[in-house]
Amino acid sequence: TLLCVAMGLGSCNNTIPTDALQGEWQLVTMGTTAVTAEAQPTLQLNIKEMKVNGSDSCNTFIGGITNITDKDLVFSELATTLMLCPETTMQVADTFGAAMKKVAKYEVNDKQLLLKDDKGTVLLTFTKK
């Protein structure tokens, strides 16, 4: 325990819910706005390899997980393809991409994944696929 405090970890009892996070997630809301099936981003988390990939509804993306604890989740800069899509799909893709850049925290409950900013505001809500 002394080592944990010295390292600034506060508590060594924090465990990452790897099994709960691992897998494919489908976006249901961005902020308070529901997304439609025609433009529905997905997120694939590989916690063991610290990788993330998915679709923003127009383009595919890939990146890394740079920090993960029992509450914190930070992604690296995401690389995306550069497809041109219908305007409404592009709006979803742009909003999703901007939200992913702000993700700092998460919560998993009842087969839902909530991605939050550093203040705890829910940015993106996913359900397990």
Label every PLM stretch briefly.
Residues 1-2:
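Sec-dependent signal peptide recognition
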Residues 12-129:
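Lipid interaction determinants
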